[in-house]
C-alpha cells in the first residue's frame, strides 16, 4: 500500500531539502604531501572578508587552479556534512594531479564575515569573483588557467560568474541546475516522493500546492504584496491540515510556512533562469550528474546544459551521467537524502577521475 502525505506539511519540508545536510562534526582526515595556506580575502563590493584554504601541489612552480563552489546551505570550505568533507577529498585529489585548489567558507559561515541568511545566489557569485580576483594576484597561479567547479547551487553560481568573466578557463558543473528554479524543485519533489513510495494522488496534490506558491513568488515582485498574497494562499491550504503540530497555533503554522518560502535565497532561486547566464558562457564546460540524483535530475538538466551552450555557439561542452551516484556524488542504493550521512564514501573516485581527466585534456589542447 502506498503512503499518503499531507499537502501543506510537505511544502515546508520539501523547500528545505537541498540545504539540510550540512550539520555535524567530520572525522579527522589523513594529510597528503601538499602545501596548504589559510587565506583571507576581501569582497570589496559588500565590504566583507572571506576565509579559505589554498592548496598547492607539493612542488615549486606556477599551477592551473580551480575554485570549489559549494551548494546550498551553511557550508564551510570542506562542504562538510556528517562525517564527510567532500571538498577536502576533492582538493587532495586535484592537488596530487597538479592543480591548485581554492575553497572557502561561505559568507557568514566559519571564519567568513557577512550575513548568510540575507544572501542569495548573486551574493555568493560576488564572493566567488572575489576569490578569483585574489588568485589573479598570486605568482604561483597560472592566470589563464583558472577554472570553477560548482556543486549543486555552486554550478548555478559558476554559470553566473563565467557569463561575465572572460578569464575563466573552464567550468565543471557537479549536479548544477540548467532549468528554472521552480522546475528544479517540482521535479525534486516528485522524484523524492516516488522513491519514498507515496501514492500518485498525494504527489499530484502536493505538486499543485507547491506550484501555486511558486507562481505567486514569480508573479509578485513587491515584497509587501508578495507576502500578503502568500499568506492568503497558505491560509487556504493549511486551514484543515491534520498534521499541524499540536504545540503551534494556526497562525504560527501559517507564518512558519510563509517565512520558509519567502526567505531571500528561496525567492531568488524560484525566479532564477539558468539559461539567461549559461548562454553567455564561452569557456569549455563539463556537466556531470549522478543517475541516482533525486534533487537535480540528470535527465532534466544534462540535455539542457548541452542544448543551451550549443545553441549559443559554444560547442565545447561535455555532459555525462555517472551510474549509481547520488546528488552528493556518493555511490548510493536509492539516492534518498537519508542515506547521505550513512554512506562511507564522501565523494566518488570515479567522479573525481572523470573531471580531472577532462580538465587536464581541456587545458592541454
What feature does the model see in each segment?
Residues 25-61:
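N-terminal cap/lid segment of alpha/beta-hydrolase-fold proteins
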Residues 62-71:
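Short beta-strand element of the alpha/beta-hydrolase
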Residues 89-111:
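Conserved alpha/beta-hydrolase
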Residues 118-139:
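Alpha/beta-hydrolase active-site loop
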Residues 134-199:
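Primarily recognizes the serine-hydrolase "nucleophile elbow" in alpha/beta-hydrolase
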Residues 174-280:
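Accessory cap/linker subdomain of secreted extracellular hydrolases
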Residues 281, 287-289:
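Short beta-strand/loop motif that positions the catalytic acidic residue
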Residues 294-300:
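Conserved alpha/beta-hydrolase "acid-adjacent" motif
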Amino acid at each position: 500500500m502506498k503512503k499518503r502525505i499531507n499537502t501543506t506539511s510537505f511544502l515546508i519540508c520539501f523547500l528545505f531539502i537541498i540545504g539540510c545536510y550540512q550539520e555535524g562534526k567530520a572525522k579527522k582526515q589523513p594529510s597528503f604531501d601538499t602545501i596548504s595556506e589559510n587565506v583571507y580575502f576581501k569582497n570589496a563590493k559588500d565590504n566583507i572578508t572571506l576565509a579559505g584554504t589554498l592548496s598547492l601541489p607539493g612542488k615549486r612552480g606556477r599551477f592551473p587552479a580551480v575554485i570549489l563552489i559549494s551548494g546550498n546551505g551553511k557550508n564551510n570550505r570542506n562542504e562538510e556534512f556528517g562525517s564527510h568533507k567532500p571538498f577536502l577529498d576533492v582538493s587532495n585529489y586535484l592537488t596530487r594531479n597538479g592543480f591548485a585548489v581554492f575553497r572557502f567558507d561561505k559568507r557568514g559561515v566559519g571564519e567568513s564575515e557577512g550575513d548568510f541568511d540575507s544572501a542569495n545566489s548573486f551574493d555568493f557569485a560576488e564572493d566567488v569573483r572575489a576569490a578569483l580576483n585574489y588568485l589573479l594576484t598570486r605568482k604561483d597561479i597560472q592566470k589563464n588557467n583558472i577554472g570553477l567547479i560548482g556543486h549543486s547551487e555552486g554550478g548555478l553560481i559558476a554559470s553566473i560568474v563565467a557569463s561575465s568573466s572572460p578569464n575563466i578557463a573552464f567550468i565543471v558543473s557537479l549536479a548544477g541546475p540548467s532549468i528554472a528554479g521552480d522546475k528544479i524543485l517540482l521535479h525534486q519533489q516528485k522524484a523524492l516522493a516516488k522513491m519514498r513510495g507515496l501514492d500518485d494522488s498525494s504527489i499530484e496534490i502536493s505538486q499543485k500546492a507547491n506550484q501555486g506558491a511558486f507562481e505567486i513568488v514569480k508573479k509578485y515582485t513587491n515584497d509587501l504584496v508578495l507576502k500578503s498574497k502568500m499568506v492568503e494562499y497558505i491560509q487556504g491550504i493549511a486551514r484543515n491540515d491534520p498534521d499541524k503540530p499540536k504545540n503551534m497555533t494556526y497562525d504560527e503554522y501559517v507564518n512558519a510556512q510563509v517565512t520558509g518560502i519567502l526567505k531571500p535565497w528561496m525567492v531568488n532561486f524560484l525566479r532564477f533562469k539558468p539559461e539567461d547566464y549559461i548562454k553567455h558562457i564561452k569557456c569549455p564546460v563539463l556537466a556531470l550528474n549522478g543517475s541516482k540524483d533525486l534533487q537535480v535530475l540528470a535527465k532534466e538538466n544534462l540535455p539542457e546544459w548541452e542544448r543551451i551552450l550549443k545553441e549559443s555557439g559554444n560547442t565545447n561542452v561535455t555532459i555525462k551521467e555517472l551510474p549509481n551516484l547520488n546528488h552528493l556524488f556518493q555511490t548510493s542504493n536509492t539516492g534518498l537524502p537519508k542515506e547521505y550521512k550513512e554512506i562511507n564514501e564522501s565523494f566518488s573516485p570515479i567522479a573525481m577521475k572523470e573531471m580531472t581527466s577532462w580538465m587536464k585534456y581541456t587545458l592541454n589542447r
